[in-house]
């Protein structure tokens, strides 16, 4: 079978759908020139493939090696329907490539009048100069030039030339496609890993930053007493199920390495510059999580969980809390598969009881409905996102576990929280597990909240 880039170029929707259904495939990977599948589908005008990729979570503002976004390519080739779709999904309309050109520069240069008018109507600036000091208006022929000027003035644009400068867009992070070869290699040669910095250590192991095959990664060393052949066999069986590349809100385990040759069994995953949601909310990173960002994170997490809940069987021993959610370079929240526990890791121990449903604290794992218990954990995350506080911060884990399970301890919703979020929190935290909603029911609710 041809590769995914060819299928997207040729608009082979059936093949693309089959490829997307395989959890080992990462739809945000790039080819040798940094073109993602979405770049190719937009360039060639393959509307149905574009729809499918966007619905599965393709990154809209991803850039190839020349810093072109999919909108640059759709605009240069005059695919009006795709341009409108990308705008609808919040494409950066004034994105600048390595020549300083915006999508509007190309629509004007190639004479795609309707596309150029659509872009201006949606906020594309007519007077941004590229590296060669040319604006989109300079690139347009008559009568388009006059139409765009008039349109821009009506919309309140200032027609004074905005000079090109490198730093103009440095506020926006450049999102590149990921290296597509990483999902092909499950077993890892320990000698190829370089460890640079120890990030953390706790009872279950050590966390290191390192590099592998030219990529920044996180290496998790598991401290396991009495490493036996049985445990080694379980490890080999369990970690490949955590290599889920096919959803943008799930962070896969890239691979693993046995002990020996490694000093401890290790799993590796992509390095996330912002760390976990817990770091972002409670440990003072550079950015502020306002209500809009909080809802966006909640939406990301709900989408990731809705996907994980479609898997049969469910991923066992996955605990949803703010430490097991990572924040990607483009501020996307991703559920970390490297935080799933292995069957031989302290069975029966609760690491973060503040996020655990009361019934899960009282009963054996096989006696509860895991999907409903996850929804409770999500409600605690919602509480944490809007209050920016650690749940039950003044109690020890032991006390939290006892009080939530036996004394009815619950997070209290402070005044001043948006009524929509308040209501959602309450339905997700229903005392009766059977009455809690499913994730696919709350994704559309959060999507509407984002648009408000």
Swiss-Prot record:
The residues the record assigns to binding Mg(2+) are: 339
Residues of the Protein kinase domain: 193-446
Where is this protein primarily located? other
Localization, per the record, is: Cell junction, Focal adhesion; Cell membrane; Cell projection, Lamellipodium; Cytoplasm, Myofibril, Sarcomere
User: SMART domains from the xrefs?
Assistant: ANK
Q: Which residues does the record give as ATP binding sites?
A: 200, 202, 204, 270, 272, 279, 341
- What Gene Ontology biological process does one annotation of this record name? neural precursor cell proliferation
The record describes its membrane topology as: Peripheral membrane protein
Gene Ontology MF terms: ATP binding; integrin binding; magnesium ion binding; protein kinase activity; protein kinase binding
**Transmembrane feature ranges:** none
Q: Which GO terms describe its cellular component?
A: actin cytoskeleton; cell cortex; centrosome; chromatin; cytoplasm; cytosol; focal adhesion; lamellipodium
Q: Which InterPro entries match?
A: Ankyrin_rpt (IPR002110), Ankyrin_rpt-contain_sf (IPR036770), Kinase-like_dom_sf (IPR011009), PK_ILK (IPR035692), Prot_kinase_dom (IPR000719), Ser-Thr/Tyr_kinase_cat_dom (IPR001245), Ser/Thr_Kinases-Pseudokinases (IPR051681)
The ANK repeat units are at 2-30, 31-63, 64-96, 97-129, 130-174
> According to the UniProt entry, where does the motif Nuclear localization signal sit in this chain?
363-371
| Lineage: superkingdom | Eukaryota
Q: Which UniProt keywords apply?
A: ANK repeat, ATP-binding, Cell junction, Cell membrane, Cell projection, Cytoplasm, Cytoskeleton, Magnesium, Membrane, Metal-binding, Nucleotide-binding, Nucleus, Phosphoprotein, Repeat
Assembly and interaction partners = Interacts with PXN/PAXILLIN (via LD motif 4).
Q: Which family does it belong to?
A: Belongs to the protein kinase superfamily. TKL Ser/Thr protein kinase family.
Domain text: The kinase domain is likely to have lost catalytic activity but retains ATP-binding activity. ATP structurally stabilizes the kinase domain.
Its biological purpose: Scaffold protein which mediates protein-protein interactions during a range of cellular events including focal adhesion assembly, cell adhesion and cell migration.
Name of the protein this chain belongs to: Scaffold protein ILK
Which gene name does the record give?
Answer: ILK
